[in-house]
Amino acid sequence: MILVAVGANLPGPWGAHPVDTCRRAVDEIARIPGLRIQAVSAWYRSAPVPASDQPDYANGVLLLSGKADPAVLLAQLQDIERKGGRVRGVLNAARTLDLDIIDIDGLVRDGPDPVLPHPRAHQRPFVLLPLRDVAPGWIEPRLGRNVTLLLADLRGGCGEVDAPVDWPVQYR
């Protein structure tokens, strides 16, 4: 099981709305040899973290099957980010596309990049809510806690995350 988080909060070359960019990123990820998309979460709207005057983000998670070398997959995702207009610069800056590897088959890896599982995924409801859509039984490999318990740990202090009716999409 491979989990990849997809997010955006700026228009980019693939669309005027962040969800358009996220959907196109899903199509691009589907073209990675050796991987198959099993599920795509609903698209959730979330406030930027840390809080700022940036536009809200669209966030989702993909469940993939297949085999992936972590460093190779990271390079492939960063290439897709560049195609989607991502320019790396200031930490936590607004972006046209953000793709993060959350987990690859429960692998625990401290480096080189990517660190797995994603070191902050368990602290982010905008990752955990869509992750629960596609992998409700997922257990964070370092903590040994499932996604439902991780979400319960965050209640009441991690910002607003909404799933508006017009944002969800099913992958074709």
Where are the regions a protein language model picked out?
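A generic structural signal for short beta-strands and their flanking turns/coil linkers
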Residues: I2, P33-A39, D56-G60, R95-L99, ...
